[in-house]
């Protein structure tokens, strides 16, 4: 079996490695000590998952939250190649028509990509491990589990069993039995209310007190209480509310600054009244936070805690949002400088349940090259998992979006597993499949995709997909707040009038 080293300077080297037999099939790997310096990426066992046009079977390819998981059948098609640089599930599969194999990545998981390729009728699927010229932080290792069952659900079942036995996951029912806060939340529908925000994307890249755009109030704390009352009148028993934009200057207003509570919504006094009221109605209530980005308009902004590149520059994020230009926070410094105190302060307001931390399981894990707090991707994953474990301890649960499964053992709910389930398919996509759902149903709660939130007001296809793929009901007020970016669907829930709450 072959591996290929592609170096930063353009050199390419190939070598053979020997597989090691195991009860489940075999495993193969490369010790980190045997990986030379200066490697850009490693193409691993590129000669193993191979087929020819006309063969029976398929490739199973988890591409990431943008595209979900696809099947590629071995039919005649033009030459093409696709590189998925961010793979949110740590596996990939091959069915020959007679047997199936799933590769489970157990070493260098956080630096995993997948390459799909067709050239002159020959199909290839292999993992690519990104080293970026740095030393490998751990061994590259992949286990190959074989089965005579050729259905993709069998491969999902193998990965599910692996995650439950070796991946640290436990069933939701077991966790809920051990923590009444999680039990209460897991029994409830999720209701997400976007309360306040500045224009997004912001017309002002670098904001300060003089040029900061005004906050738009979408739902005051008093009005949120009226939404809770309306739910109670309809005899809805189990709900967990999540407030987005409760913090100073609203959604993504001045992160990592949270306080004071946004005054235009009613401030801290009205927020505490709301929390007490909602809990008095028998409902849960949590809030939306962030642990990855810093806006220069924050009163605590400091380049000290930002991610540094190899060139010692700070790492700006590509998405311009309500607070203007965000910069990536070093995961270690986020935990040390902000999360412990922030969660304590948020809990003191009264929030309890499945706490939401934005984007933590949908973004590629950053490397930090600051000599005072350097972090490779494996270390970054551990710092983020510390945040998740702290969230569970303080509030009762942790949630984010998309479900990048380096964090599967510490995640209770994901807002959506990927974006659209059905969209224009590319040359290598023949079918979308619910791999995340088959693996994690009953372990992690989820909404199937962005287009199945608010499913009662969506079209028939979205409603059916919601039930078929086993979602946690999710209602979102003011989902479409960003100009021209209705990525949660065109349909929305509004709260301006009493009629809209009926």
Q: Where do the model's predicted regions map?
A:
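Carbohydrate-recognition beta-sandwich/jelly-roll modules
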Residues: 1-240, 284, 490-493
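Structural alpha-beta junctions
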Residues: 36, 51-54, 234-237, 280-282, ...
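Short acidic, gly/pro-rich beta-turn/loop elements at beta-sheet edges
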Residues: 38-40, 52, 251, 295-297, ...
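Active-site-proximal substrate-binding groove within the catalytic cores of carbohydrate-active enzymes
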Residues: 97-102, 107-153, 212, 306-319, ...
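Aromatic-lined carbohydrate-binding/catalytic grooves of carbohydrate-active enzymes
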Residues: 187-340, 352, 361-372
